[in-house]
């Protein structure tokens, strides 16, 4: 009996020394659970009445709003790219979650859809509780702004398989549109292009910016006007959900382009139609955030074409509307303090469709 106990004791000592647990492998389940406890009340504040279950289940349930007779679901997914690196350098992660939501829901609303719910994916080498809380808090804030329920997500630790202290984000949004309201793009001669002011660079062009900071040894603390460059770069992406929703009720928005990767030109090309040209006014390009764009253009030695295909050039969303609806649209946008410019016109063409700068 005593011998057996001794053997077991020795085995326990040996096993404790050589024990391989999830935690020693780099995954801290207890820390993950603490993060979930923090997320639950944040998510609950974003819940619409259509949410049918709580955070923490294996899946999330959402009832399609009753007002839709023939609902069509609309989905989008995106990330925030290397803007995360700027957040890392400045150790400020409070708004990067807003960027994540914005990148997804702004894509969603270009089809005329109403955002319904959102899920996120956060992957990191090891959970940093404060950093993760800041990120998720930003996501919840973005969901509140867009009236979109944060109904689930995933936080993954990839020990020794992901750079130390680094993370990445992905978001997934789902919305709905009435089937009869799905439009095919159809333009008329002299329709106008309305550029809605961006809050800054939004979430694109940051790989170029990081390279620029490195090569030219530009400090994020350096001033651009009255603000530091770092603060300007981290300004969260503008969410246009409320403005677009109200505009759609009052005027006919013929098409929309969310100005993201590919810059102003690259995204406008996605809504060009056969037999119509887009004629952009040169003096309206870089109308907003002039000092920032002038700095980037000079320091990186970029041509106008490269700037237009890399950055949003001051416009986060471009709409095509009839000219006779401009006054009505202006009243709505003023109500939401949304600045804008008429940046061009649509002209009928017999040649191949193109974007011209005049």
Model regions and ranges:
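Glycine-/charge-enriched secondary-structure boundary and capping motifs
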Residues: 13-25, 35, 41, 131-149, ...
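Glycine-rich phosphate/pyrophosphate-binding loop regions near the starts of catalytic domains
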Residues: 41-199, 279
